[in-house]
């Protein structure tokens, strides 16, 4: 088994957390941390950060008070502090924001212990902070292991039987967004109502393929050729397809694997 590398603490290690790969190309890859209704991003072995804030002052007190005008932080936000200047005792690492006001805040470690700067050397300059980049998701920690996904360039299609189909789009390292796409349908069974959300997804021969809703666990939906959100069926070669497995037992489709053929597992 290949070795692993420690990249950072998850947001809450008491909850189930899952890493999902996102690869635009071999030289541009990410690890996505899915936890309890949030997503964080790792790139090149580091946590992706939001905008950097410059610290203009740090008091010698318990707890030490940091000044950064209009910083925008809230209590409980996790930030990475970079220290390349004085007050060397304040190490470059992750902290939690506490005591937040418009222009000032204090810090605790990740266990909630306040950072006491009383005996630290005097601050001069060289300290910045940046919030750990995070996006809200609909998936709870109890659901993340049942999330399935398929990616095309900068867009990932994500499914879970309890949630509407989502897209996850990337426009920059710290610019990701979830959306509920508009799906065109003209036939039943549908994909866009409660108990009709798919559980499995893949790409196959220029089509986006969904499968296994709660109401139709053995049905597959193939999009129109090269038109991934169009599930309009018809008689043309490139129209969408809806296919239900004929079987003596109604075993739900559990996975789809696209190779030279489409492998379907129950």
Protein language model regions, located:
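N-terminal beta-propeller domains
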Residues: 1-52, 163, 167-265
């Amino acid at each position: 088994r290949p070795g692993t590398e420690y990249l950072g603490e998850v947001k809450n290690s008491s909850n189930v957390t899952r890493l999902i790969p996102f690869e635009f190309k071999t030289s541009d890859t990410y690890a996505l941390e899915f936890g309890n209704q949030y997503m964080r991003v790792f790139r090149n072995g580091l946590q992706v950060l939001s905008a950097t804030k410059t610290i203009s002052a740090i008091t010698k007190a318990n707890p030490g008070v940091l000044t950064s005008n209009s910083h925008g932080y809230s209590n409980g936000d996790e930030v990475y502090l970079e220290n390349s200047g004085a007050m060397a005792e304040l190490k470059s690492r992750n902290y939690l924001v506490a005591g937040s006001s418009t222009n000032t805040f204090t810090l605790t470690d990740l266990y909630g212990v306040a950072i006491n700067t009383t005996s630290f050397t005097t601050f001069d300059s060289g300290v910045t902070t940046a919030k750990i980049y995070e996006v809200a998701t609909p998936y709870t920690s109890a659901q993340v292991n049942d999330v399935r996904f398929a990616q095309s360039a900068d867009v990932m299609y994500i499914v879970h039987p309890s949630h509407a189909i989502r897209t996850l789009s990337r426009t920059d390292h710290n610019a990701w967004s979830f959306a509920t796409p508009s799906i065109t349908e003209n036939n039943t069974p549908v994909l866009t109502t409660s108990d009709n959300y798919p559980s499995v997804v893949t790409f196959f021969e220029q089509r986006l393929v969904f499968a296994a809703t709660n109401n139709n666990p053995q049905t597959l939906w193939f999009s129109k050729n090269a038109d991934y959100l169009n599930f309009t069926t018809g008689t043309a070669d490139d129209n969408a397809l809806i296919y239900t497995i004929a079987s003596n037992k109604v075993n739900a489709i559990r996975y789809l694997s696209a190779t030279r053929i489409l492998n379907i597992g129950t």
